[in-house]
């Protein structure tokens, strides 16, 4: 019986140590989540201004085109896949990988660029063609990371190595809700650029636009020519889109990890309560047995 008591005490100690770790990881994830959300909010005005400018140029010029807007027959498809470098984040990594596998209809004609070791390992084990891998940047991405990935992918599209590009990432909704998303990155659609440029603006931007008359917007001219402007703006737009997806994914990963660690901490606490109750019962039973033996021995002497 005494041995059983010691065993329960060891289990309580072990679970308590685990609970301290999961609680610490929960706090760290909360801090990282806050930073990721600040990054996301900081980039939004720049991105909205850029997409509005591109949409306006395409709409007003009428015939302004760019190689990254060319629609062609799809033979090969490239995927930028954003996952984490670590686990312990619930279904965060698995959901993105599953979404990509569902989207790929022809494994032989899919080219992958993986951000994060979890995605890299998943698709490498399934013998997909991984053309590029980017590790150690998933938790704290910066714009230069996004430009590095984007430059290689856009060069491949430009050279005809693949005919369309998708990006798979996780959209951050709230701390407890994240959704795996698949978004077409290239080729860009003129119609979608025009529409996005009109609707993806903040209230502050809308107020500024309202001060300009339709005539002022119509007679606006661009220097240099629209095609030259698009050569500069579109690569930055695509890089900003990739960067935004990285930030969304980083926030989603920390949100998923915080939720998972919070759940683990709660479960560990409940387990400790159960083990403590069990320990008290076993200890009480042992004490009762000892008392009974003493009483029985005393009666035997009498």
Curated annotation (Swiss-Prot):
Entry keyword annotation includes Transport: yes
Record key words, sorted: ATP synthesis, Cell membrane, CF(1), Hydrogen ion transport, Ion transport, Membrane, Transport
Keyword Nucleotide-binding: no
Bilayer topology annotation: Peripheral membrane protein
One Pfam match: ATP-synt
One GO MF term attached to the UniProt entry: proton-transporting ATP synthase activity, rotational mechanism
Cellular component terms (Gene Ontology): plasma membrane; proton-transporting ATP synthase complex
GO annotation, biological process: proton motive force-driven plasma membrane ATP synthesis
Protein activity control: Inhibited by nitrate.
Subcellular location: Cell membrane
Subunit structure: F-type ATPases have 2 components, CF(1) - the catalytic core - and CF(0) - the membrane proton channel. CF(1) has five subunits: alpha(3), beta(3), gamma(1), delta(1), epsilon(1). CF(0) has three main subunits: a, b and c.
Classification via PANTHER family: ATP SYNTHASE GAMMA CHAIN, ATP SYNTHASE SUBUNIT GAMMA, MITOCHONDRIAL
Role according to the record: Produces ATP from ADP in the presence of a proton gradient across the membrane. The gamma chain is believed to be important in regulating ATPase activity and the flow of protons through the CF(0) complex.
Family in the record: Belongs to the ATPase gamma chain family.
NCBIfam families tied to this protein: ATPsyn_F1gamma
Name assigned to this protein: ATP synthase gamma chain, sodium ion specific
Record organism: Acetobacterium woodii (strain ATCC 29683 / DSM 1030 / JCM 2381 / KCTC 1655 / WB1)
Gene name tied to this protein: atpG
């Amino acid at each position: 019986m005494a041995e059983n008591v010691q065993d329960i005490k060891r289990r309580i100690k072990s679970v308590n140590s685990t609970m301290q770790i999961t609680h610490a990881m929960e706090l760290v994830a909360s801090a990282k989540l806050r930073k990721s959300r600040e990054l996301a909010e900081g980039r939004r005005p720049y991105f909205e201004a850029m997409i509005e400018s591109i949409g306006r140029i395409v709409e007003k010029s009428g015939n302004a085109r760019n190689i990254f807007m060319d629609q062609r027959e799809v033979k090969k498809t490239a995927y930028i896949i954003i996952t984490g470098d670590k686990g312990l984040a619930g279904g965060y990594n698995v959901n993105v990988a599953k979404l990509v596998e569902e989207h790929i209809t022809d494994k032989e004609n899919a080219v992958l660029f993986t951000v994060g070791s979890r995605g890299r390992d998943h698709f490498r084990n399934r013998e997909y063609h991984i053309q590029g891998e980017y590790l150690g940047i998933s938790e704290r991405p910066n714009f230069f990371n996004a430009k590095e990935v984007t430059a290689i992918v856009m060069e491949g599209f430009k050279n005809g190595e693949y005919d369309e590009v998708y990006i798979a990432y996780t959209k951050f909704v709230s701390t407890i809700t994240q959704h795996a998303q698949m978004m077409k990155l290239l080729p860009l659609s003129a119609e979608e650029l025009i529409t996005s440029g009109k609707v993806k603006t903040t209230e502050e931007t809308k107020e500024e636009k309202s001060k300009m008359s339709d005539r002022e917007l119509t007679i606006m001219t661009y220097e240099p020519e629209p095609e030259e402007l698009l050569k500069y703006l579109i690569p930055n737009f695509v890089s900003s889109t990739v960067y935004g997806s990285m930030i969304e994914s980083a926030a989603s990963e920390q949100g998923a990890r915080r939720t998972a660690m919070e759940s683990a901490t709660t479960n560990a606490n409940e387990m400790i309560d159960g083990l403590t109750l069990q320990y008290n019962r076993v200890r009480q039973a042992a004490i009762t047995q000892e008392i009974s033996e003493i009483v029985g021995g005393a009666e035997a002497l009498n």
